[in-house]
Amino acid sequence: MSHKKAGGSTRNGRDSNAQRRGVKKFGGQTVVAGNILVRQLGTKIHPGSNVGMGKDYTLFSKIDGVVAYERKGRDKKRVSVYEA
């Protein structure tokens, strides 16, 4: 004979994995072609010279060189890669 009332089941207990977004290479760092510079949602940072953008807005280097973050007007930022 049970002396404890059955406990209800909870609907919590899940947590999704982190998506690991953010800047991967900072200004002044040297990169090789294909290196990921920024993982982002939307164009928080725009691609500059020698930088490509993937379909998920990932910015990557097209050449070997040095990373430089620049302002594009008053409210936009962009990242470029210049030959070392």
From Swiss-Prot:
Top-level division of the source organism's lineage: Bacteria
Region called Disordered, residue ranges: 1-25
The cross-references to SUPFAM superfamilies, in alphabetical order and at most eight, read: Ribosomal L27 protein-like
Mind telling me which Pfam families this protein's record contains?
Answer: Ribosomal_L27
GO terms (molecular function) for this protein are: structural constituent of ribosome
What Gene Ontology cellular component terms go with this record? cytosolic large ribosomal subunit
Q: Name one GO biological process term.
A: translation
| Stored InterPro entries | Ribosomal_bL27 (IPR001684)
Keywords of the record, alphabetical order, are: Ribonucleoprotein, Ribosomal protein
Keyword Chaperone listed? The answer is no
Membrane-spanning residues where? none
Does the record carry Transmembrane as a key word? no
Hey, which family's this protein in? Belongs to the bacterial ribosomal protein bL27 family.
- HAMAP family associated with the record: Ribosomal_bL27
What is the recorded name of this protein? Large ribosomal subunit protein bL27
Q: Which organism does this record belong to? A: Desulforapulum autotrophicum (strain ATCC 43914 / DSM 3382 / VKM B-1955 / HRM2)
Gene (name only)? rpmA
